[in-house]
A protein has these predicted regions:
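Conserved N-terminal subdomain of the carbohydrate kinase-like
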Residues: 1-41, 208-215
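A general structural signal for well-ordered alpha-helical segments in protein cores
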Residues: 2, 27, 58, 96-99, ...
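Conserved phosphate-binding/catalytic region of the ribokinase-like
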Residues: 63-64, 110-215
Length: 215
């Protein structure tokens, strides 16, 4: 694996190590394991692809699983994200800056995010969840609904892992009720609760934020 160092501060600093060389044998073992996924399973593809692997690794994985009923979540940026859209990922989660970079625009408000999130949906994404830090979040759902919410009230302590927590919270909420609004609120609650705590949030902390945003 590799060692990543996160310096916890308001601005946040990350010192990320270079990933290891992954031999072809290990890549084949991974693909064999992933091929066993099926109906009802959820697969998260997040971050950059190791330099020793083909840059179309995500596409190959999604192509292999196409039609098997696996819900695939992709948390990646720019070209890596755009290349997987034809494979219809269940969820993608760019932030407003990443979304703006794709289209060459600056997106500062929730309202401005919506048309660009819809463009990603037209290109193949089923659900587009856009995080906006202090501005809140937007969900353009597969149902055709659009949900917006301001950021919950709380003191920002540690932003490390907040985005990952948001994605996990959304999927946990969706798997619980298969309701997009509930999933959206769970995503916001999990991401915000983690940002409000020294470490990843507890179930109780997430529940407290969820209650705040659903009153």
């Amino acid at each position: 694996s590799r060692i990543n160092v996160k310096l916890k501060s308001i601005d946040g600093t990350e010192i990320n190590g270079q990933g290891p060389e992954i031999p072809e044998k290990k890549v084949k073992e991974l693909m064999k394991q992933l091929s066993a996924l099926g109906e009802g399973d959820v697969l998260f593809l997040a971050g950059s692809i190791p330099s020793s692997m083909a840059d179309d690794a995500y596409q190959k994985i999604m192509e292999m699983l196409d039609g098997k009923g696996v819900r695939i979540v992709v948390d990646a940026t720019r070209d890596l994200l755009m290349k997987v859209l034809p494979y219809h990922p269940f969820l993608i989660k760019p932030n407003n800056h990443e979304l703006g970079e794709i289209f060459g625009v600056e997106l500062k408000t929730r309202e401005s995010v919506v048309p660009y999130a819809k463009q990603l949906q037209k290109k193949g994404a089923q659900n587009v969840l856009v995080s906006m830090a202090g501005e809140g979040a937007v969900l353009v759902a597969a149902s055709g609904e659009v949900f917006e919410a301001p950021a919950p009230k709380g003191k920002l302590i540690n932003g490390v892992g907040a985005g990952d927590s948001m994605v996990a919270g959304f999927m946990a909420g969706y798997m619980e009720k298969e309701d997009y609004l509930h999933a959206f609120h769970m995503g916001i609650a999990a991401g915000s609760a983690s940002a409000f705590s020294e470490n990843l949030a507890t179930r109780e902390e997430i529940a407290s934020v969820y209650e705040q945003i659903t009153k």
